[in-house]
Regions:
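Internal, well-ordered alpha/beta segment that forms a basic, Gly-enriched binding/recognition surface
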Residues: 102-201
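Cysteine-centered loop/knuckle micro-motif
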Residues: 30-34
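Short, intrinsically disordered linker segments that flank or connect zinc-binding domains
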Residues: 4-12
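Extracellular cysteine-rich, disulfide-stabilized repeat modules
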Residues: 19-22
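Extracellular repeat turn/loop positions enriched in glycine and acidic/polar residues, especially those
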Residues: 24-26
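Metal-centered catalytic cores of metalloenzymes
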Residues: 51-60, 66-69, 123, 177-183, ...
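Charge-dense, low-complexity intrinsically disordered regions
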Residues: 45-48, 207-377
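An N-terminal structural lobe/cap that precedes and organizes the functional/catalytic core
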Residues: 17, 35-140, 144-146
Length: 377
């Protein structure tokens, strides 16, 4: 549940009587969960007695229940083979490089009492960064220019490095909305809980906006127009100990000036996305940051700043937006295990703050955020 100081005035915090019921029944709320919302009161005292292990199990089960298969490639008539657990970060050349004994570290939810925090968890490279978003044929063919060839800052490569995290996030946003609808289905009383309805509205907005961006990419692909992607590329002369691929909105530029509002203030709000991929190579690291030119008004200034900044300034900025922007990040075991406890705690709490605006504000005011360096060698 998102923690905010005050709910925005332009977000509906109630479900309208003739609005489609958020439980997913496709009936009007008035004739579905509205009568049940007062009949089925949840016993929070009993819930709080549940052990954390049970809460974690229920959370993971509810999320796993939202899994679905789809091929997000643009030419569906060419689909062949089963939908597979496609890697959004390449396994052979990237994940293998930072793994030890075939494992990495990732962020996962950690249930402590009534609070959901975060912790590090070891994950197999066979499962890391995977999602059921492409058929076997398209997973191999579509991304061949970035899978089989070295990166050379070519237009088609930049398009694909942007599309891959977009596809992952489209899939995740659909699942997140389904996750919240399933909660309402199980717990009709929560349909009149303002915080839960706000999270539901946010999930609706995210699904709509990511699907809209997907359609923009689909149009460009069908027209073979790969030049609508602006890319900033930086090659480091050392290997980082993590890999990430994300699609997200950036709130502030390098000077701290606001670009976007990342908290939903209105249901007609637009989400302006950037695409970030960072991965190590032999004695080097590729950093690829892109946006679609339809969002040039939002990101032109930021990219001009990046193009004129020193490497130190760029890495300091990326150190923040990587953790703020995406959960799709995987660390080498050596990196996590060699962090000082204060650095490890800061990394975890900074990731948690990306999901909780009140916590982010508190850490910023205390100058206690981002006390780690992702780009240390």
């Amino acid at each position: 549940m998102m923690l905010i100081e005050k709910f925005p005035r332009n977000v509906r915090l109630t479900i309208g009587p003739y609005e489609q019921c958020p439980c997913g029944s496709k009936k009007s709320f008035k004739f579905c969960c509205k009568p049940k919302s007062t009949e089925h009161k949840h016993n929070w005292k009993e819930y709080r007695k549940h052990p954390d292990k049970r809460k974690k199990y229920e959370y993971v089960k509810n999320w796993n229940d939202t899994a679905f298969e789809i091929c997000l490639a643009f030419d569906h008539e060419e689909c062949r083979g089963n939908i597979k657990n496609a890697h959004s970060i390449q396994k052979k050349r990237i994940l293998n490089r930072i793994s030890r004994d075939g494992h990495l570290y990732q962020f996962i939810p950690d249930h402590v009492g009534d609070i959901v925090l975060a912790k590090f968890d070891r994950v197999s490279i066979n499962k890391a960064s995977t999602f059921q978003g492409f058929c076997d044929f398209h997973d191999n063919k579509l991304f061949l220019p970035i899978e089989a060839s070295d990166y050379c800052n070519e237009a088609r490569q930049n398009f694909l490095f942007s599309f891959r995290p977009l596809a992952l996030e489209c899939h995740n946003k659909i699942r997140d909305l389904t996750f919240r609808m399933n909660i309402f289905s199980e717990r009709p009383d929560l349909t009149i809980n303002e915080a839960m309805v706000y999270d539901y509205r946010t999930a609706q907005l995210n699904e709509r906006e990511f699907k809209k961006e997907y359609e923009v990419f689909k149009k460009d692909y069908s027209e073979k127009n790969f030049n609508n992607i602006r890319t900033f590329y930086l090659k480091l002369d050392f290997e980082v100990n993590f890999a990430t691929s994300g699609a997200f909105s950036v709130e502030f530029d390098m000077n701290g000036q606001q670009i976007n509002e990342n908290q939903m203030l209105s249901e007609i709000q637009e989400i302006k996305l950037i695409y970030l991929t960072i991965y190590p190579l032999e004695n080097s690291t590729n950093i690829i940051l892109s946006y679609h030119l339809r969002n040039d008004k939002s990101y032109n200034r930021l990219f001009e700043q990046l193009e004129n900044a020193s490497q130190t300034q760029i890495l300091k900025y990326l150190n923040k937006i990587v953790i703020n922007g995406t959960e799709n990040i995987y660390f080498s075991q050596n990196f996590i295990e060699n962090l000082k406890e204060a650095e490890k705690d800061s990394l975890l709490i900074s990731f948690q703050a990306s999901l909780k605006p009140l916590l982010a504000k508190k850490l910023y005011e205390e100058n206690n955020d981002y006390r780690f360096d992702l780009f240390t060698t």
